[in-house]
């Protein structure tokens, strides 16, 4: 594999950052100088290009990986063990100052059905400087939650009936504009680019629901919500987005619970957990059973943020919010593979 020099990566990051700034300036010019349909059309194009640049920028520091994905109970965990262990020995995971057998002490036991609910990354890098919290957990962000819940609704609903009307989308946007349009306080927890990422997901993956997608477009929901979303407090996001999953009460409840959990960590994208989070007989955060306990279980687990703040989070909700959990394997693995 050809390695790209850090200097080249830094140059690309600098260029994308400059381009992002230019798109912001273009967006401001459009807002101040164009009107009506011409303004909306130009704004869509600029905002869409800007959010693509932002996605590229955010991905530049990610390491290349090889990934395993497949059907349930076909031996993925054992394949990982065979790929990463040394001379057929058990695959050891470094958790603080101790090592643990991945298959026997961490990996969820198979019971004839899917057992793992969290993506696991293995690395030789030391991912935490705190031996008491050696596990790095990358969290889903607010936009990810919205997309996942929308996907759940559109993918798991056999027949969608009485979906939110164009008029309802328009009235919702109008009421939110009246309430938040003049607000000066803004946050970066959910921004305009995120709204256009959601819009793009609808276009790419819900294309079979052409009428619904077109009706949302006609209501100008995406553009109007994008203009004010950074002013809306997180405890009212469900008012903004529940219409997308047709006001399904269960999905809205899940959304509110998970957003509240993200709020506890100030919407950081990473937390660090102690070893009990993954060990069998303790937290077992990797086990898909945690997701089934989402609404009922009150068990908590200790995590530390990037600012070294120690918090207790709901275990099941942390599992649901985990985009990726990173475990450290022995450095000598790289020398033998």
Predicted regions, residues:
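N-terminal low-complexity/disordered regulatory or targeting extensions
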Residues: 1-72, 86-336
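Conserved glycine(s) of the Walker
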Residues: 74-76
